[in-house]
Amino acid sequence: MKKLAGFALLVILFASTLPAQKAETTIPLRFDQYYTLDQVYEALRALHKAYPQLTTLETVGTSEEGRPLMAMTVNNPKTGPALDKPGMYVDGNMHGNEIQGGDISLYLLDYLLGNYGKNPEVTGLVDRLCFYVVPVVNVDGRHHFLSDPNTPDSNRSLRIPTDDDRDGLADEDAPEDLDADGNICAMRKKDPFGRYRTDPEEPRLMVPVKPGEKGEWSLLGDEGVDNDGDGQVNEDGEGYVDPNRNWGFDWAPPYVQGGSGEYPFSGVGLKGLAEWAMAKTNIAFVWSYHNNGGMILRGPSRKGLGEYPQQDVAVYDYLGKQGERIIPGYRYMISWKDLYTTYGDSGEWATQTLGAYFYCAEVFAPESEAFKGVSERPEPGTRGEEAVRDIFSSEVSERERLKFSDSVVQGELYKPWKAFKHPVYGDIEIGGWVKMSSRLGPPFMIKDLVHRNAMAVLFTAKHLPEVAFEVLEVKALGGDLFRVRTRLSNPRAVPTMSYLAQKANLYPKDMLKVSGAKVVAGGVLVDPFLDRVSFKKDRPELQFLVVPGFGKIEHEFIVEGKGGLTLRYESRHGGKIAKTVKLD
């Protein structure tokens, strides 16, 4: 296997001569480079080897080109089976070019495992919860993006051959690295009737001509030639099936939304991942890492789905606004309202199928490359400040980004224009933004990005349900009758079942079961001071409920009998707890 270039993943085991002493393990993941797919695989295997008691590593699907989708589960079996605990799911690299999510996922795993037993907060989370992490969803895409020449925006698709130009051939005319520099840059040609002229303030850039101005350049698109002789250049590249438009909830065909594929889950790796996730019934929250905009997005993904229940919105608002504080510059937003409409995306699938809460993080913030001094920056809260933070705004101008490239990374992000003889266009120039630019921060910025995003996950994880079960009272009423009162409480923000899942009846509510004696009556204790109880008519020994976030629910049972009485609480997202009391 290819060794881990750059960080050289090492597993150093110091075996003590004392047989009772445990070995210590060090895995120095440095996070000062973007790791190739093979390096991600090797890191996962090394983490599993170093922490076998806390991790499970499995292949959950296979890509179109035969590469495994690997998932790591972090769970302490000494504190209970994984499925009996609230589950946090994290994935990254849904689109092939959006590689930061893979590195965030690795950092999260390394942080959880490396700090277990050292940091009380981390130890408590690993003992209480279960973490499911899929660092790379689009494994073919990550491999080809880092290994092959690309633009910053290319190689997003699943590797499903698609005939984009309807000529009977698939993927036959993709961009090409004409000057063999490892990048797919832009082509331009001198043209007095062109739509662009040289930027008078920065000759490496171009600006659109205004009415009445003479043109100087025509942009010809990305590097490439007419491979199939149809008179078009680069008209049929890889795919295009968008892995975040191919999920099975609210999917729409390509004439509604490009890139959706011929049918839901036509991506074989996605289908395998979805089937695996469906079996993880304890997944209560999902973070999915994408890469452009500096945003924490929640659904709905389109207006027609309607707003989420207000109780769920309150959960999203509380956690999302804290996320803005953990990751300065990020904005908490609603997908359809603040960005754009999507169909068949993974977030709505997780929300409406798994019944989980969901955030999509767009991790690269364009303002991080805004080359401005303090006095040049817009005042916080002004329209100018908002524009700088808007990925669709030109306020973070190409001029600023070029100055950032020149001054902060010594010109690595932009290729100067160079002459080239094109077989069709003749004398042209090739240049512009390189592959590892525009939506990928330079390597020195990686550590801060992955740490802050992982900490946002951990803050959310702290607010997964933490249910406490108390027997408040066992009171003899005379004869063999007893009154038993219980309380289920949750000091965290996330309830044991989302209100959307309740509304859609996605799965059974939590259950409180009483056994060991005859339950004469039972129900929700509405007011313990006035003895008001909402009794359940049928089968009072079985109560269906949801424990709210930052709240409680109390029950009262009238039971008949002597001896032991067992009360069992069971929840998909709240865990399992049993209590036994004596009736005497």
Model-based region annotation:
Residues 1-7:
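Bacterial N-terminal signal peptides that target proteins for export
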Residues 7-16:
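Bacterial N-terminal signal peptides
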Residues 20-25:
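Boundary at the C-terminal end of the N-terminal hydrophobic targeting segment
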Residues 46-88:
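N-terminal beta-rich core of secreted/periplasmic extracellular enzymes
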Residues 56, 68-69, 132-134, 140, ...:
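Metallocarboxypeptidase
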Residues 101-147:
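Short helix-loop-beta-strand segments that form the rim/entrance of peptidase-like active sites
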Residues 163-167, 181, 226-230:
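Acidic carboxylate motifs that coordinate Ca2+ or other divalent cations, activating on Asp/Glu
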Residues 489-584:
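C-terminal beta-sandwich/jelly-roll accessory domains of carbohydrate-active enzymes
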